Amino acid sequence: DDALWDAFVRQALGGTIFSTSAWLNCAARATDGEAHRIGCFRNGNLIAGLSGLARKRSGLNRLETPELTPHTGLLLAPVQSKGPAKAEAEQHRACELLIDYLEKKYDHVFLVHPPAITDMRPFTWRNWDARLRYTYQIDPSDSEALWDKIERRTRTVIRKAEKLGYALQPTDDVALFRRLYEALYNKQSDGAPVAADTAERFVAAVLKTGLGQAYKIESADGQVASVVVFVNGF
């Protein structure tokens, strides 16, 4: 049920656009997988969940956070009117039930959890591998403060580009995105982290469904320096 799941995502700890049905379906179409959303219910209420893409590779049933998606993974409903110990115990029990299901259903699981999910003990207690990652979160609402945080040399490059007539413009040219993507990674020995056709399909799906917008940096004489895709939050 898309409506039930998406309502849960919006109020859950760790809920972001990347766990919504719309995003998972875009990822499934672009990367050849099937969106799986797994819920833990109590008294008819969804209290915890996991999401990712299911694929079968080398004969193994896999559940994974898809390419070009920062995180899917675990979501937890807020626990009301309970002390921290009781809330923690309730969330751990929900995780145990989800882990039971994962171990029975899939041969391999690789999920990147949202930054808000920090307690991995239910997984490590079951001998799952857990790796710590770090990320940056920036508040874009104050443009002056954001500008002050940019490195000086980057600010210099931006000012120079403005003087040369480069400007930000909306675009829906997915082929342009792919050309620049390939041009960038063709120069690197390791190649692209995600195949160009996959990246192109994903961007096309995101733009078509209204989950994001693309912009190009273009000079007055039509030279495009870069393309960026922004994803809408909620």
Language-model-detected regions and their locations in the chain:
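Acyl-donor binding region in acyl/amide transferases
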Residues: R57-W128, F234
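A conserved beta-strand-loop-helix scaffold within acyl/acetyltransferase catalytic domains
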Residues: D1-L60, P114-F234
